[in-house]
Amino acid sequence: MKILANAIREGNILEYQNNLWIVSKKPDHTKPGKGGAYIQLEMKNLKTGTKIYERFSSSDYLEKATLEQRNYQYLYQENNHLVLMDLESFEQILVQKSIIASNKLPFLLENTVVTVETYKDEPIRLVLPHTVVVEILETSPNIKGATVTASYKPAILSNGAKIMVPPYLSAGEKIVVKLEDISFVERAK
């Protein structure tokens, strides 16, 4: 599907130079004083991980990859593969662990429903939910009278990830973590 260069957004997957590329940063729209407007894109190759910077005229058309999405339930990890179960047919599939960002892998908890995006029947990317609930395993003790302030303290979560949390939280509490930037959202209800 063709897409106008100025309609490209961060996270779009494009077919460019016979490869699949993900737009890894927000496109930079520039209108110089002289000449036509252009869009600067930072793209990452989905297979090799290499980054390139390309400049396109705002009137150029690029090929946006058509991906199929299907929901699966994460079961467990086996060597360099993840075992997922199709929620409709209950078939199990193996996908490479590399289709998920390494900083988000600890947040892939058993029985989590994930979306697998495929291109020509090949898994390209595994999309986690926007937020997950995780328990704080270790953090410095509560500060008496602490309120919501700008100061945060480090905490280690039950999945081994490190995150900054407000000072009023203590070990054993469950929190909601936003996976986009791996940040604290709120106490779990």
UniProtKB/Swiss-Prot annotation:
GO MF term set: translation elongation factor activity
Annotated metabolic or biological route of this protein: Protein biosynthesis; polypeptide chain elongation
Cellular localization per UniProt: Cytoplasm
Keywords associated with the record: Cytoplasm, Elongation factor, Protein biosynthesis
Keyword Protein biosynthesis set for record: yes
Pfam families: EFP, EFP_N, Elong-fact-P_C
GO annotation, biological process: peptide biosynthetic process
Gene3D superfamilies according to UniProt: 2.30.30.30, Nucleic acid-binding proteins (2.40.50.140)
GO cellular component: cytoplasm
Matches recorded under InterPro entries: Elong-fact-P_C, NA-bd_OB-fold, Rib_uL2_dom2, Transl_elong_fac_P/YeiP, Transl_elong_KOW-like, Transl_elong_P/YeiP_cen, Transl_elong_P/YeiP_CS, Transl_elongation_fac_P
Family: Belongs to the elongation factor P family.
Main function: Involved in peptide bond synthesis. Stimulates efficient translation and peptide-bond synthesis on native or reconstituted 70S ribosomes in vitro. Probably functions indirectly by altering the affinity of the ribosome for aminoacyl-tRNA, thus increasing their reactivity as acceptors for peptidyl transferase.
HAMAP family named among the record's database cross-references: EF_P
UniProt name for this protein: Elongation factor P
Source organism (scientific name): Orientia tsutsugamushi (strain Boryong) (Rickettsia tsutsugamushi)
Gene name for this UniProt entry: efp
